[in-house]
A protein has these predicted regions:
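N-terminal glycine-rich anion-binding loops that anchor highly charged ligand groups
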Residues: 12-19, 40-53
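Structural signal for conserved beta-strand scaffold positions within catalytic alpha/beta enzyme cores
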Residues: 16, 89, 221-223
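Short, contiguous, helix-prone interaction/anchoring segments in small proteins
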Residues: 34-38
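Cofactor-binding active-site loop characterized by glycine-rich and histidine/acidic residues
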Residues: 47-50, 54-180, 198-204, 209-216
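Glycine-rich ThDP/TPP pyrophosphate-binding loop and its adjacent helix/strand module
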Residues: 128, 132-294
Length: 294
């Protein structure tokens, strides 16, 4: 038998759920003090998220998509970009956007029904929140193509959920990135659920990262609750993009600890024990435990 091709998907993890090291730290975070500003930012994101949910519950905010449990992934992605890069988020990546200069009041304006919240004071080159699923991925691919044609030292980063990786725009984006060797990083935030559809019902692929193989992209799976792994995965992908080596697909393994939005009741389709188990992998507790031990 002749084998036409084989592939492997590397999994990155440095901090286990108990906050203990399971691998050699990357040089950039060998000193635990380097993680303190990121922990503070994660704490801010969680506080903002909790307050926003409370505002919605008391009728002071419209439907809101919480990011509870995504703090390490979002902050790590935002910390890995340069100001001149372009970020194309979905509707949940507040942690990354805060790192990019988006104001908390702009988030509240948007979810309060005021589209002026999408006119960011800070990152003028970033795309606004995108509610249609995965269309932002193709927008980012277009930006990446422009950077290449202009020979600019810039990259494009886009986020979508596990459900978004089943959409045609996601596939079109990764195919374009591979065909034209674009400086694009596609971040698939796998939180286990596409609203009420579990990961197991979305695709037959063993990993979501491997979907990039078909487009000729570099693929990686990362523990999205371990901010050190997030930073290292993004470092590899952004360096490849800046060096002209093409795009990447990174699957960040995390969990949606809240409902899909405040208009959803996840208790109707999600097992209570599953959520309890997910809290044991909480990114905030994990990083706090590690930092306290240093």
């Amino acid at each position: 038998m002749t084998v036409a091709a084989t592939f492997e998907i590397e999994y990155l993890q440095f901090l286990g759920p108990d906050g203990k090291l399971v691998g050699t730290l990357p040089p950039a975070v060998a000193d635990a003090k380097a993680l303190l500003p990121l922990f503070k930012q994660m704490l801010f994101v969680r506080t903002f998220d909790t307050k926003s949910i409370a505002l919605q519950r008391t009728g002071k905010l419209g439907t809101y998509a919480a990011c509870l449990g995504h703090e390490a992934t979002h902050v790590g992605i935002g910390a890995s970009m340069k100001p001149e890069d372009v970020f194309a988020p979905s509707y949940r990546e507040y942690g990354a956007q805060f790192m990019r200069g988006v104001k908390p009041r702009e988030v509240l304006m948007y979810w309060g029904g005021d589209e002026r919240g999408n006119d960011f004071e800070g990152p003028k080159n970033d795309y606004p929140w995108c509610v249609p699923i995965a269309t932002q991925c193709l927008m980012a691919a277009g930006a990446a193509l422009a950077f290449k044609l202009r020979k600019e030292d810039r990259i494009a980063v886009s986020c979508c959920g596990d459900g978004g990786s089943s959409k045609t725009d996601f596939y079109a984006a990764l195919n374009s990135a591979g065909a034209y060797t674009l400086p694009l990083v596609l971040c698939v935030i796998n939180n286990g659920w596409a609203i009420s559809v579990p990961r197991s019902a979305q695709t037959g692929a063993k990993t979501l990262a491997q979907k990039g193989i078909a487009g000729g992209l570099h693929c990686l799976q990362v523990d999205g609750n371990d901010i050190i792994a997030v930073l290292e995965g993004m470092r590899r992908a952004t360096e490849r993009a800046r060096n002209g080596e093409g795009g990447s697909v990174i699957e960040f393994m995390t969990y949606r600890l809240h409902d899909h939005t405040t208009a959803d009741d996840a208790r109707r389709y999600r097992d209570e024990q599953e959520v309890k188990d997910a809290w044991l992998r909480d990114p905030m507790t994990r990083l706090r435990t590690y930092l306290t031990a240093q």
